[in-house]
Amino acid sequence: MAKLYFRYGAMNSGKSTGLLQAAFNYEERGQRVLLAKPATDTKGERDVVSRLGMTRSVDFLVGPDESVLEAFEHAAAERDEPVACLLIDEAQFLQRAQIDELLRIAVERGVPVIAYGIRTDFLTHAFTGSARLLELAHSL
C-alpha cells in the first residue's frame, strides 16, 4: 500500500530542496513524478523554488476550492506512463478536504504522496493543511 508522508520543518530548513532531490531520485531511476503546490503560494509562481536557487515547474497548481484528486488524475492522464510519486510543496496552504484527497491518492490509487510544509505560523498556530496532515499521514 502506498503511503501519505508529511515532511515538515522550519522555514529555511531545506524542504523545497528535499522535494527537488526526491523528484531527481525518482526520475534518475526512470520513474515519473508529478509536482504540485497550492495556487495561493505565489513564491515562484508555477515553480518550486529552493533557497539554493534550484527551480522546477509544477505539473499543476491547486486553488483553495479545487479538487487535488481531479487535478492529479488530469495530469496523470497526460502521458501513458504510471506516476510513481506525487510531491506537494507548501502543503500547509491546502484545505482539509484537499489533504483528505491526498490520502485517497495514496490509498486508493496506490501512488505515494510526499507533502512538504511547515506546521505552524509565527504565532505557533497550526496551518489547516498541516493540522490535517498530522492527523492523517502514515509517516512524519
Language model features by range: what are they?
Residues M1-A77, D121-R132:
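Conserved P-loop
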Residues D89-A91, I118:
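Walker B catalytic acidic pair
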